[in-house]
Structure formats: structure tokens, C-alpha cells
């Protein structure tokens, strides 16, 4: 299933269920293995710190609309999810609904996965989103997780004391094997992205050649790039 087909499926599910917070439930119920090699690497890694570094490095193999970043202060571990490409499907309302679904499913999915190391991690979590509050959040079981609205960045934080929390199912051999598959997936993605970018630039040059070649900044603007 292509990314576009999956996006249409999500929008239809949101419409049919009339549940704009479906992303939260989806994230809580998703299994790590649904993320392929990255999920298997996550399940076999040594501790929370390794899991966070792993996801930051190979997140792009699962979805390219966002990029994760994490850092630590004196008290908390912060995990942020920043926009890379705009989420668009249909009109502005559908696009916003899809974006909210993706962000919520990724944030709450990450919290759900980290709970495999310790169930207490979720209890200390606070989620940050960049949109306004909505009454329908009251109908969702947030598992004691607090949500902060109108924030500058989307993400979540949890107590620093869990950084070195061990994985009881850690398996170094399985982890290294999964990493090889992750590297292979990332290499394929880079090759495909380079090939697609070359095609897109070539198309822009050919399409507008009769009016003179566009500048590089103009091509970047048309391709939604910097």
C-alpha cells in the first residue's frame, strides 16, 4: 500500500468512526513489529537510551513527513517530532485531521513502545501538541498522560531516571541483525529519494524550458524544498 493510499484510508476511518482522536487509540494498540526491521531492533535493544538513538537514526525508513529529535535536561528526557514535509490530502480540514492523526499516533505509539521497558514511563509522560484544545479529548483514555496544547513543537517528555532502564528481552545478536536490515532500508530510501529528486528537477527544467530555465531557488520552491 502506498503512502497516498494509506492516507486516504486514515481519512476515511476518521470520517466513518467520527473519532478525531483515533490516532491516540491507534498508537496505543500498534505493535513494534508493525514497523518492520526498526520494530525488531527496538524490541531487542539494550535500554531506553539505545531505543531513542535507534529511532532517531532510522525513523526516516518508516515515514518521511516528520523527523524525531531528543535531548536531556536536568530532570526530563524530551522527544520532539518536527515537520519536514507538509501533510496534504484533500482540503485544509482533511489535511489537518490527517496531520493530527499522524502526530498523535506517533507520539502515543512511542510512549506505548517505551512502556515495554517500564510501565511507569507512561505514568510520567507529558505530551505537547501545536494545536488548540478540543472537547473530544475528554472521551479518550489517556492513561494518566497530560496533554499541553498550543505548544511550539510536538513531542513528549518523561523522567530522566528512565534513560538507562534495561530491556528484559534484550538480545544483542538479534539487535545487530535487525540493524543490518535497517541500514539496508535506509540505503534504499536514499537511492530512491535521489532518483526521484533528479526526475523532479529534470521535469521542472523541461516543462519551463520554453520560458527560460528557472533558478535553483525557484525550483526548490516549486518542489517544496529548501
Where are these regions (language model features)?
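A short, terminal or domain-edge coil/loop segment
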Residues: 41-55, 80-87, 124-136, 171-191
